[in-house]
Amino acid sequence: MTNYIIIGIAAVVILFIIVYVKMTLDEKKGADSEEKRKIKNIVRNVVPEGESYTAAYGTREDFSLGGGGRTITTTTRYWYYAVAFKPGDLYLVPLSFDGGDLSYGEPLHYGKDDLGMVDLKNGYMTLYDKDRKEIMTLFVVASNTKDDQYHPVNIQQKEEAEAFKQFADSLMQEVNGANGISDIKAAKKAARKK
């Protein structure tokens, strides 16, 4: 019996070491990865005056439950973006990954004057139009590791993530202040009544 406990503990320790080593290697690879360079090049090439923007990798995951009766289904949808930002101005370039190849679409522009409201919650930034209808939600995180087909990049972007957080805070204050929004919850509720 004691041998089984010792073997079990040893297996857990070995598994922990393997996972830790993999995470550490992925983080080191992501600090100056090919994917990070591609994101910066995409921003430079497709965003007007792209070199004047901070470039980052952004994602959005949407998890939903559905079904009825005895059947419950879960759906997770993923979006990937090259994010370009500077004070008062945001571009999102949709990305797609197919068999390791990175492709991109036309950039979407969101200037502070185009937005009706911005909400920040738990690291997510949600943009709303002038009628306070949700446009989209995204987040930029410091560590992205290639875990599976739904997490396809190794990109470490601590400085960019911190800069995006400051940008998002500033954009929220500017946009909400310009549109007379002091209570986001009340503004959302009023928009639903329309």
Predicted segments — roles?
Residues 131-134, 141-194:
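Terminal and domain-flanking low-complexity segments
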Residues 3, 41, 45, 122, ...:
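Detector for Asparagine
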Residues 74-79, 86-141:
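Phosphoinositide-binding peripheral membrane targeting modules
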Residues 2-5, 13-87:
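Anionic N-terminal interaction surfaces
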Residues 24-31, 100, 148-155:
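Short, flexible/disordered intra-domain loops and linkers
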Residues 13-14, 104-116, 159-161, 165-172:
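Charged, low-complexity, helix/coiled-coil-prone segments
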